[in-house]
Amino acid sequence: MTIRLVIVEPEGAYNLGFIARLVKNFLIDEFYVVNPKCDINEAIKFSAKGSEVIEKMMKITNNFDDAIRDVDLKIATSSIADIKGDLLRKSIRPIDLERLIKDKKVAFIFGRESVGLTREEIAKSDFLLFIPANPEYPVLNLSHAVGIVLYELWRNRDNKVPTVSSEPIKLIDDYSKKITDILVNKEATKSMYLVLKRVLIKGIEDNEEAMTIVRILRKIYVRLAKKENESDKLL
């Protein structure tokens, strides 16, 4: 398992410093910061032993897509989740992570202190992670939220769970997109695709199940594509 931590436009130097320390605490593999809005030198003052993380390990980019490239799964985080009728906000919990990320390269994405991640940024992710808290005050400090997630990853790192390789996951992603492109009107395609992909991937226990799902999706796609081509010829 390889973990990449992505922080988008951090606004507080203290939070960035505390997060750098957490990166060292929990042996995170990669640390990306997108378009930081705070003073990096100021952040170093808050990082203690994590100063070398900022100075040597942290990668700064101005492009969100660059920060989430070349990973198997992208997991966004938000304190706003499971809003009725909002498919984009359907979430998973920290307890779901163990099985989903085993033996994969995963990016965990945290947003701005003020407004979090945009809907566009969440839509580019595979899952939305929500940390349950007091419903009347669910918003956690950025560095605290990062700490909770990284602790969960550390706690489960040596547990033996069935693994699903990245290749069938990519195929499920691909066929889910192709099927929804055919079946659903363009306005609803993105939401339906995300829901289909999330439900399928979340429910898979091992590679055998994953490949069974891939075969089913492939057959569905081939039949749908054939019917669509036949319909086009009649026009």
Curated annotation (Swiss-Prot):
Consequence of substituting residue 89 to E: Loss of activity
Keyword Disulfide bond: no
Lineage: superkingdom: Archaea
GO molecular function: RNA binding; tRNA (cytidine(32)/uridine(32)-2'-O)-methyltransferase activity
Alphabetical list of CDD domains matching this protein: SpoU-like_TrmJ (cd18093)
Main localisation: cytoplasm
UniProt entry tagged with the keyword Cytoplasm: yes
Outcome recorded upon mutating residue 14 to S: No change in activity
Pfam families: SpoU_methylase
Residues reported to bind S-adenosyl-L-methionine: 77-79, 111, 131, 138-140
Keyword annotations from UniProtKB, A to Z: Cytoplasm, Methyltransferase, S-adenosyl-L-methionine, Transferase, tRNA processing
Catalytic activity: cytidine(32) in tRNA + S-adenosyl-L-methionine = 2'-O-methylcytidine(32) in tRNA + S-adenosyl-L-homocysteine + H(+)
Family per record: Belongs to the class IV-like SAM-binding methyltransferase superfamily. RNA methyltransferase TrmH family.
Location of this chain's protein in the cell: Cytoplasm
Entry's Gene Ontology BP terms: tRNA nucleoside ribose methylation
Classification via NCBIfam families: tRNAmeth_TrmJ_Sulfolob
Protein name as annotated: tRNA (cytidine-2'-O-)-methyltransferase TrmJ
Gene Ontology terms: cellular component: cytosol
Enzyme nomenclature, EC number: 2.1.1.-
Complexes and interactors: Homodimer.
Main function: Catalyzes the formation of 2'O-methylated cytidine (Cm32) at position 32 in tRNA. Is specific for cytidine.
